[in-house]
């Protein structure tokens, strides 16, 4: 095998509770995380020159060691002791710094792809152990299930939900720094005793749990986030929420036709990035 081609899916957070700040500077979280079929395309090929090379061609996405995909490949080569060359080409379809986990998904997908390409035989559990050192969301994309994520996001429990659910994603072309959002978050009520269901049999069940503690911070700086939430509801979403630290907002719809109609309406009324997607 000389190369592999893979899809790196985005995610949305149906729920994001920030429980407390930890002594190590991270936060304990409780999230419901869901993969969607908006994907980056990744090709990993063996090269005659040792080392890792990443090409992307998207403004704001580094090609070298600052790219999580580069660090993922380098980590596996170091751990496995394999002295080979890898060329990684990433076609970005997921908006950058948008709360959709695009970077983490790229890193996770490269871990799985290099493992396959080189026949390393690492289990998903081992790849998740490696991945969490690259980013807190990386293990989720290796887990490959809708998940309740706890701790810093690395403690994962499978959640049963209806599939597929159709969503409309709207991004107002704003890059939001996750670090800035957490630095400006003011923790208030404790939520440890809140019960989050592990089964969602209909779309109304999902809409009932939509909540994101980071929304108020991001909306305070970018009021357009609130505007997008309201417009999604006006075009028929049963619920709308900012994903992650933003700036992407998603709305849930009863079926594909409703989602596509809403996406067409919002795209015609704005210059935002708008797309209808379904859950995986």
UniProtKB/Swiss-Prot annotation:
The keyword Transferase applies. Transmembrane segments: none annotated. InterPro entries: GHMP_kinase_C_dom, GHMP_kinase_C_sf, GHMP_kinase_N_dom, IspE, Ribosomal_Su5_D2-typ_SF, Ribsml_uS5_D2-typ_fold_subgr. The keyword Transferase applies. The active site is at 11, 137. This is 4-diphosphocytidyl-2-C-methyl-D-erythritol kinase. ATP binds at residues 95-105. One of its GO terms (biological process) is terpenoid biosynthetic process. Disulfide bonds: none annotated. Belongs to the GHMP kinase family. IspE subfamily. Keywords: ATP-binding, Isoprene biosynthesis, Kinase, Nucleotide-binding, Transferase. It comes from Geotalea uraniireducens (strain Rf4). SUPFAM superfamilies: GHMP Kinase, C-terminal domain, Ribosomal protein S5 domain 2-like. Catalyzes the phosphorylation of the position 2 hydroxy group of 4-diphosphocytidyl-2C-methyl-D-erythritol. It catalyses: 4-CDP-2-C-methyl-D-erythritol + ATP = 4-CDP-2-C-methyl-D-erythritol 2-phosphate + ADP + H(+). One of its GO terms (molecular function) is ATP binding. The gene is ispE. Its EC number is 2.7.1.148. It is an enzyme of class 2 (transferase). Pathway: Isoprenoid biosynthesis; isopentenyl diphosphate biosynthesis via DXP pathway; isopentenyl diphosphate from 1-deoxy-D-xylulose 5-phosphate: step 3/6.
